[in-house]
Amino acid sequence: MQQNWIENFLIKSSFFGTFHQIFIQSKKPKYVWKDKFYIDTKVSTFGYDGGYPDLIRLDMPFEYLTFWINAENQYITLFNDLSLTIRSVSFQPAVGWYLITSDALRVNLGDDLSNDTYQKLSLTLKYMFENNLTPSIIDLRYKAGAALNYGK
Protein backbone atom coordinates (compact mmCIF):
# COMPACT_ATOMS: atom_id res chain seq x y z
CA MET A 1 0.00 0.00 0.00
CA GLN A 2 1.67 3.23 -1.15
CA GLN A 3 -0.23 6.42 -0.33
CA ASN A 4 1.70 9.60 0.43
CA TRP A 5 -0.80 10.77 3.09
CA ILE A 6 -0.29 7.66 5.23
CA GLU A 7 2.15 7.95 8.13
CA ASN A 8 1.94 4.25 8.98
CA PHE A 9 -0.51 1.38 8.95
CA LEU A 10 -1.11 -2.02 10.53
CA ILE A 11 -3.09 -4.94 9.17
CA LYS A 12 -4.37 -7.53 11.65
CA SER A 13 -5.93 -10.81 10.63
CA SER A 14 -7.73 -13.31 12.81
CA PHE A 15 -6.07 -16.65 13.43
CA PHE A 16 -8.51 -18.39 11.09
CA GLY A 17 -8.46 -15.58 8.51
CA THR A 18 -12.17 -14.87 8.89
CA PHE A 19 -11.73 -11.12 9.38
CA HIS A 20 -9.15 -8.42 8.88
CA GLN A 21 -8.60 -5.11 10.63
CA ILE A 22 -6.70 -2.23 9.11
CA PHE A 23 -5.40 0.61 11.24
CA ILE A 24 -4.21 3.72 9.39
CA GLN A 25 -2.47 6.73 10.87
CA SER A 26 -2.55 9.64 8.46
CA LYS A 27 0.05 12.38 8.25
CA LYS A 28 -0.85 15.65 9.94
CA PRO A 29 -0.35 18.65 7.67
CA LYS A 30 1.40 21.71 9.07
CA TYR A 31 1.37 23.91 5.95
CA VAL A 32 -0.14 24.19 2.51
CA TRP A 33 2.64 24.58 -0.07
CA LYS A 34 1.90 26.35 -3.37
CA ASP A 35 -1.80 25.44 -2.98
CA LYS A 36 -0.93 21.97 -4.33
CA PHE A 37 0.58 20.03 -1.45
CA TYR A 38 0.49 19.66 2.30
CA ILE A 39 3.78 19.63 4.18
CA ASP A 40 4.15 17.90 7.53
CA THR A 41 6.64 18.51 10.34
CA LYS A 42 9.16 16.20 8.63
CA VAL A 43 8.98 18.41 5.50
CA SER A 44 7.47 15.61 3.45
CA THR A 45 4.82 16.54 0.91
CA PHE A 46 1.51 14.86 0.21
CA GLY A 47 -1.58 15.69 -1.83
CA TYR A 48 -3.63 18.78 -1.01
CA ASP A 49 -7.38 18.22 -0.88
CA GLY A 50 -8.57 21.69 0.15
CA GLY A 51 -9.06 20.83 3.81
CA TYR A 52 -7.50 22.57 6.81
CA PRO A 53 -8.29 26.17 5.81
CA ASP A 54 -6.43 27.64 8.81
CA LEU A 55 -3.00 26.31 7.85
CA ILE A 56 -0.33 28.80 6.82
CA ARG A 57 0.08 28.92 3.04
CA LEU A 58 3.69 28.77 1.85
CA ASP A 59 4.74 29.93 -1.60
CA MET A 60 8.46 29.53 -2.18
CA PRO A 61 10.91 27.15 -3.83
CA PHE A 62 11.30 23.90 -1.90
CA GLU A 63 14.89 24.73 -0.90
CA TYR A 64 13.66 27.82 1.00
CA LEU A 65 11.21 25.90 3.21
CA THR A 66 13.82 25.17 5.87
CA PHE A 67 14.64 28.89 6.19
CA TRP A 68 11.01 29.55 7.17
CA ILE A 69 10.75 26.45 9.37
CA ASN A 70 13.83 27.56 11.32
CA ALA A 71 12.46 31.08 11.85
CA GLU A 72 8.73 30.44 12.15
CA ASN A 73 8.38 30.09 15.93
CA GLN A 74 9.65 33.56 16.74
CA TYR A 75 7.56 35.19 13.99
CA ILE A 76 4.38 33.31 14.88
CA THR A 77 4.85 34.11 18.57
CA LEU A 78 5.41 37.80 17.81
CA PHE A 79 2.28 38.02 15.67
CA ASN A 80 0.16 35.97 18.08
CA ASP A 81 1.21 38.22 20.99
CA LEU A 82 -0.32 41.11 19.03
CA SER A 83 -3.46 39.15 18.08
CA LEU A 84 -2.34 38.90 14.46
CA THR A 85 -2.45 35.67 12.48
CA ILE A 86 -0.04 34.85 9.67
CA ARG A 87 -2.01 33.46 6.72
CA SER A 88 0.74 33.14 4.13
CA VAL A 89 4.52 33.30 3.80
CA SER A 90 6.19 33.79 0.44
CA PHE A 91 9.64 34.16 -1.00
CA GLN A 92 10.34 35.55 -4.45
CA PRO A 93 13.90 36.35 -5.52
CA ALA A 94 12.97 39.83 -6.80
CA VAL A 95 10.96 40.75 -3.68
CA GLY A 96 12.37 38.62 -0.88
CA TRP A 97 10.34 37.30 2.03
CA TYR A 98 6.87 38.62 2.78
CA LEU A 99 4.04 37.66 5.10
CA ILE A 100 0.32 38.33 4.82
CA THR A 101 -1.90 38.30 7.89
CA SER A 102 -5.58 37.45 8.22
CA ASP A 103 -6.23 41.22 8.39
CA ALA A 104 -4.58 41.62 4.94
CA LEU A 105 -1.50 43.33 6.40
CA ARG A 106 1.49 42.65 4.16
CA VAL A 107 4.95 42.62 5.76
CA ASN A 108 7.92 42.81 3.38
CA LEU A 109 10.87 41.33 5.26
CA GLY A 110 13.57 41.48 2.59
CA ASP A 111 16.18 38.95 1.55
CA ASP A 112 16.60 37.05 4.80
CA LEU A 113 14.90 36.03 8.00
CA SER A 114 17.77 37.20 10.19
CA ASN A 115 17.59 38.23 13.82
CA ASP A 116 18.08 41.86 12.69
CA THR A 117 14.99 41.62 10.48
CA TYR A 118 13.02 40.08 13.34
CA GLN A 119 14.11 42.84 15.77
CA LYS A 120 13.20 45.56 13.26
CA LEU A 121 9.77 43.97 12.77
CA SER A 122 9.25 43.66 16.52
CA LEU A 123 10.05 47.35 17.08
CA THR A 124 7.87 48.42 14.14
CA LEU A 125 4.87 46.41 15.36
CA LYS A 126 5.33 47.77 18.88
CA TYR A 127 5.42 51.33 17.48
CA MET A 128 2.30 50.67 15.40
CA PHE A 129 0.28 49.36 18.31
CA GLU A 130 1.44 52.06 20.73
CA ASN A 131 0.37 54.73 18.22
CA ASN A 132 -2.78 52.96 17.04
CA LEU A 133 -1.57 52.79 13.43
CA THR A 134 -3.10 50.42 10.87
CA PRO A 135 -1.02 50.36 7.69
CA SER A 136 -1.74 47.97 4.85
CA ILE A 137 1.97 47.33 4.20
CA ILE A 138 5.04 47.28 6.44
CA ASP A 139 8.21 47.35 4.37
CA LEU A 140 11.40 46.39 6.22
CA ARG A 141 13.66 46.18 3.17
CA TYR A 142 15.33 49.52 3.94
CA LYS A 143 18.54 49.77 5.96
CA ALA A 144 17.35 52.95 7.70
CA GLY A 145 14.19 51.39 9.12
CA ALA A 146 10.66 50.60 8.07
CA ALA A 147 8.18 52.19 5.69
CA LEU A 148 4.47 52.08 6.46
CA ASN A 149 1.98 52.28 3.59
CA TYR A 150 -1.66 53.15 4.19
CA GLY A 151 -2.74 52.97 0.54
CA LYS A 152 -4.92 49.86 0.51
Language-model-detected regions and their locations in the chain:
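Extracytoplasmic segments of membrane-associated envelope/inner-membrane machinery
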Residues: 19-94, 100
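Solvent-exposed helix-coil-helix hairpins and adjacent flexible coil/strand "hinge" segments
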Residues: 87-120, 144
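Short beta-strands and strand-coil junctions in structured, solvent-facing domains, enriched
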Residues: 7-9, 19, 28-32, 46, ...
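Stable alpha-helical elements in mature extracytoplasmic
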Residues: 2, 71, 75-78, 117-124
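Extracytoplasmic/luminal low-complexity segments enriched in Pro/Gly and acidic/polar residues
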Residues: 111-152
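Short, well-structured beta-strand/strand-turn elements
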Residues: 2-18, 87
